[in-house]
């Protein structure tokens, strides 16, 4: 057995753990300000939960899912993203829309590990169901901006936004794009050739140099907007302007999954290298009905916690400990009782089990102790303690039953 983590996973220690929890807690707190309700789904689902929703041409389905057959012969997949599982939850539990749902947890994708991208990663996830009004899009993007501000990274993260329009827009644009790209079919990358028929819009998001040159002159989706699609997108952009949220319209932004329509957006930064998206999401009005639910317009976004951790400066404000140093047999026996009492009063206590007084005092100093409590058998008999302030060096005797008040 190899004593190392599996490639694409990482341990979380000490200060990094505090940073992780800070992100979780901040996201949870902000979600409640916007009326989101917390939910949690299992980390694995029946495989069809994802294959039905993510589209058979997406990279997640074709390359990245962790899928296995369980002992009952069922195909099971570790969650690669949240939306599919949340939609399953919405339908199975018969939740009444409109409703806003917030979730946090791990997800799994078989990808090439790099900065900001691991095979096990964690996401904060926001989904709004049952609201077709563009104000829902505006509010959700505003929430994302609010979070970035809370994390202190809003200045280096920029909003890119696009609209894929409604079903009619997507159908007409898809035909026009295929017609254009077929002229260059043999020059496209292998991935883009595979996508040409199944999901040509994904080619717009290609990172291949030749693909980029080809799509630079491709038809623009905005030329195919229906009147309704154009009005919807204008309403979203006007709302962002009213809130003072700067944005750039990126006509090549399509997102990586097949279920999106109308608004799609990413908050991006150059500080993460190739993995520039901090938050990403969009509208998916037809997804719920496509998997057997009622027609339920929806919009959502997710953010990778590990990516946010790469960007934020956060250090947990560490409480200084109370150090207990007993001297003598009876005092040693009583030390745990004292430590337990102080901890139940909300104090951080270190009880040093052994060593000379000099050694223990040195360790108390290294631990940046606030005060040291010293007592031997004599103090135990007189129900007193010596308390030493480690900042001033002041020492005094106090009554044992007044310990908490004197700290």
Curated annotation (Swiss-Prot):
Name of the featured protein: Histidine--tRNA ligase
Domain of life: Bacteria
Swiss-Prot/TrEMBL catalytic activity: tRNA(His) + L-histidine + ATP = L-histidyl-tRNA(His) + AMP + diphosphate + H(+)
Subunit structure: Homodimer.
Family: Belongs to the class-II aminoacyl-tRNA synthetase family.
Record GO biological process: histidyl-tRNA aminoacylation
Regions annotated as coiled coil: none
Statement: the UniProt record of this protein carries the keyword Phosphoprotein: no
Keywords from the UniProt entry: Aminoacyl-tRNA synthetase, ATP-binding, Cytoplasm, Ligase, Nucleotide-binding, Protein biosynthesis
GO annotations of cellular component type: cytoplasm
Main location: cytoplasm
UniProt GO molecular function: ATP binding; histidine-tRNA ligase activity
Localization terms from the record: Cytoplasm
EC number(s) given by UniProt: 6.1.1.21
Protein source organism: Wolbachia pipientis subsp. Culex pipiens (strain wPip)
